[in-house]
Amino acid sequence: MDNNKVLEMRNIHKSFPGVRALKGVDFHLNKGEIHALMGENGAGKSTLIKVLTGVYSKDEGQIFIDGKDKAVSIHSPQEAQKLGISTVYQEITLCPNLSVAENMYIGRSNKIYQNWKKMNEDADKILQNLDIPAKASQQLASCSIAVQQMVAIARAVDMDCKVL
């Protein structure tokens, strides 16, 4: 596999009762590239993303992350995250009653904070680097929908992901 390829999917198949959603899909993503999946309703865009992120298991095919065959390992979104695959959902999946920083770090094994001040400082740095107009200590519910989505992106970016 090419050293620039951060993601490669080969011959991916996925079927549901009475429907073949994916038939032999091949796809690769080089480091630094941005791609968009486009197609008609029912074309398999969401299914492909859900196979990649471990929401659905694939019927056939291989998935490589940084040249390593990870197809056997991706059986849940948590396993996908450990492999460096992070997801920002179209629907906001954050907790409005928590602060921005709490939303960025909740449920994360790679960043555990005992010190709230340090957590807020780290979150503020990330927000500032990404030009997100929010403060770490701010309640998420007080942010606009657009800023809430930016916080979700900041959370994903800060996970040191290879594929977002």
How would you label these PLM feature ranges?
Residues 1-164:
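Glycine-rich phosphate-binding loops of nucleotide-dependent enzymes
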